[in-house]
Amino acid sequence: MVKNAFISVISQEENRGSVEFQVVSFTNKIRRLTSHLEFHRKDFLSQRGLRKILGKRQRLLSYLSKKDKVRYTELISQLDIRELTTR
């Protein structure tokens, strides 16, 4: 189980409304829910919550990629998540 796995650079930042902080907190929630769902495969409410959080994080990442590509690539590399795929 992953708890309090904030990246040190972003956790020291006091601006909790920033896009980076929100993406980090969503990523931590996603990792916790993923580890929970490995043990409880039939927990459909948690699966729904995971899908909602994934959508929120995807929208924030697309916003950040449009506004500031450098900050987006830094955040993606620090969190070790995949880049957005365009449809």
UniProtKB/Swiss-Prot annotation:
UniProt keyword GTP-binding, yes or no: no
Subcellular location field: Plastid, Chloroplast
Keyword check for Plastid: yes
Any one biological process term the GO annotation gives: translation
Entries under Gene3D superfamilies matching the protein: S15/NS1, RNA-binding
Cysteine pairings via disulfide bonds: none
Any coiled-coil regions, as ranges: none
Record-level Gene Ontology MF annotations: structural constituent of ribosome
Pfam family, one: Ribosomal_S15
GO-annotated cellular components: chloroplast; ribonucleoprotein complex; ribosome
Broad class of the protein's primary localization: plastid
Annotated InterPro entries: Ribosomal_uS15, Ribosomal_uS15_bac-type, uS15_NS1_RNA-bd_sf
Keywords, in A-Z order: Chloroplast, Plastid, Ribonucleoprotein, Ribosomal protein
PANTHER family in UniProt: RIBOSOMAL PROTEIN S15, BACTERIAL AND ORGANELLAR, SMALL RIBOSOMAL SUBUNIT PROTEIN US15M
Quaternary data: Part of the 30S ribosomal subunit.
NCBIfam families xref list: S15_bact
Assigned protein family: Belongs to the universal ribosomal protein uS15 family.
Name of the protein in question: Small ribosomal subunit protein uS15c
Gene it is expressed from: rps15
